[in-house]
């Protein structure tokens, strides 16, 4: 999941610090999520999707 969020940020020119500001999370939490070092909680995922203005199923594949 984190890799997909990172790929989205990279492809849209969005910095992790911007996402941290928009979600209220620390830079280190966003970094850990993007690197796959932290499992994302439901509330965190919701806030990330809301900040990026994407639907909740955006980062899910049919396989997930």
Predicted regions and their residues:
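Short, basic-rich loop-to-helix N-cap that marks the start of a DNA-contacting helix
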Residues: 37-47
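Short C-terminal boundary/hinge segments that cap the last helix of small helical domains
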Residues: 53-64
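DNA major-groove recognition helix of helix-turn-helix
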Residues: 9, 34, 44, 63
């Amino acid at each position: 999941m984190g890799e997909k969020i990172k790929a989205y940020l990279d492809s849209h020119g969005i910095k992790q610090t911007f996402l941290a500001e928009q979600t209220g999370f620390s830079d280190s939490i966003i970094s850990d999520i993007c690197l796959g070092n932290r499992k994302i909680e439901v509330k965190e995922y919701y806030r990330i999707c809301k900040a990026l203005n994407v639907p909740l199923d955006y980062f899910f594949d049919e396989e997930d």
